[in-house]
């Protein structure tokens, strides 16, 4: 068996039960949890909560580990297990992912999203190929050239698109733009679901892109750093926006949804997975004590936990949007669809909020801000931030 590759084992009933009861029921329970999260809790504007602990809106990476992931991690620490992914936890986690997507697939665990994206893309192309991505894609803006590095030079070709999304027409134009030997041959399309600006591809849009990639013999990669939030928001089965839409390989994110470290690379195109274990090892991505990366996935993929936490984060962002959109000087930049709210704020308001101790990113032009909710965001935090924003904006 290849180190780092998990053999298929029998499906776990808990994942199958989620399908039997319907994904929407799991999402609904998460929304109910979100609505009830602050009942009987006094709000303190100065601290952001009654207990003095404030949840911020800079990134879902700021949040801690979910109780379910933490419990699984602790349980995995009870005894000795084989190393390099040959342990029962890694086998169980990989099996739950296969069951979640309802199809045979190869599953690999890596340390972070940059590794997941870069190694997945490198597997899909040669150095003389190019990768078509949106001009604001994470692989372009926030991965320090890693996709080009790990593919030995495959060029990223940047495409425009409204709301952070690629279109079939844009892909076809890029493929046909040049076909001569002096131009890097397009070989892969990568999309981010949800996008860098918090918008969603619908299943229909993804199927259309998948059909275009098939038409031109391209591979189809999905950056799913917040894949759970997309599934929760769309109310679809994971298969509907991945392999059934033509996706060959998915970077399935766990860190932003409450896992301590580690993403998975899920190959629906099994041929592409051949020798990926060697690529991961060479890139320093083979964890010797792999169970401590994989065990939290077992906890998260039990009884719909992963989806409930994502639905809660989405619901908190929906409430945040509802509370701050009417405030003076606030301009919403993109539709709120998952766990992020993008707004333009006057610079004095941004500074005043920072002075009050709130942490959030301001990286879109002069006043563009991203406010991100996470699995542990509380309603009291949202209302405290909204109240401070209204005060700072003079509303």
Residue map of PLM features:
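Cationic, low-complexity basic patches in intrinsically disordered or flexible, solvent-exposed regions
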Residues: 11
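Conserved PLP-enzyme active-site core in the AAT-like
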Residues: 30-356, 361-377, 385-393
């Amino acid at each position: 068996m290849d180190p780092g590759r998990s053999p298929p084992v029998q499906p776990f009933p808990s994942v199958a039960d989620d399908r039997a009861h319907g994904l929407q029921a799991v999402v609904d329970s998460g929304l109910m949890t979100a609505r009830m999260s602050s009942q009987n809790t006094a709000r303190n504007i100065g601290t952001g909560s009654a207990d003095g602990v404030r949840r911020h809106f800079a990134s879902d990476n700021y949040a801690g580990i979910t109780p379910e992931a933490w419990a699984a991690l602790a349980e995995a620490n009870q005894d000795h297990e084989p190393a390099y992914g040959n342990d029962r936890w890694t086998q169980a986690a990989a099996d739950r992912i296969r069951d979640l997507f309802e199809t045979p697939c190869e599953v690999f665990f890596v340390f972070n999203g940059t590794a997941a994206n870069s190694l997945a893309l490198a597997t899909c192309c040669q150095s003389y190929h190019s990768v078509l991505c949106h001009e604001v894609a994470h692989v372009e803006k926030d991965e320090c050239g890693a996709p080009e590095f790990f593919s030995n030079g495959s060029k990223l070709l940047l495409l425009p698109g409204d709301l952070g999304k690629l279109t079939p027409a844009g892909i076809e134009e890029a493929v046909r733009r040049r076909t001569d030997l002096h131009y890097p041959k397009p070989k892969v399309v990568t999309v981010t679901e949800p996008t860098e600006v918090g918008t969603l591809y619908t299943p229909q849009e993804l199927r259309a892109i998948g059909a275009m990639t098939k038409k031109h013999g391209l591979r189809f990669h999905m950056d799913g750093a917040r894949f759970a939030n997309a599934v929760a928001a769309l109310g679809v089965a994971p298969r509907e926006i991945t392999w059934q839409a033509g996706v060959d390989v998915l970077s399935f994110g766990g860190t932003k949804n409450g896992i301590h470290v580690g993403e998975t690379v899920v190959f629906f195109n099994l041929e592409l997975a051949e020798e990926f274990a060697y690529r991961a090892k060479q890139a320093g991505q083979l964890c010797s004590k792999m169970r401590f990366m994989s065990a939290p996935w077992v906890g998260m993929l039990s009884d719909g936990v992963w989806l409930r936490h994502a639905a809660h984060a989405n619901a908190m962002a929906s409430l945040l949007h509802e509370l701050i959109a009417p405030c003076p000087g606030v301009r919403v930049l993109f539709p709120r669809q998952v766990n992020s709210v993008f707004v333009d704020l006057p610079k004095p308001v941004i500074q005043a909020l920072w002075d009050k101790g709130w942490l959030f990113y301001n990286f879109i032009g002069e006043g563009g801000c991203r406010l991100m909710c996470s699995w542990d965001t509380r309603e009291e935090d949202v209302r405290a931030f909204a109240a401070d924003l209204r005060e700072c904006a003079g509303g």
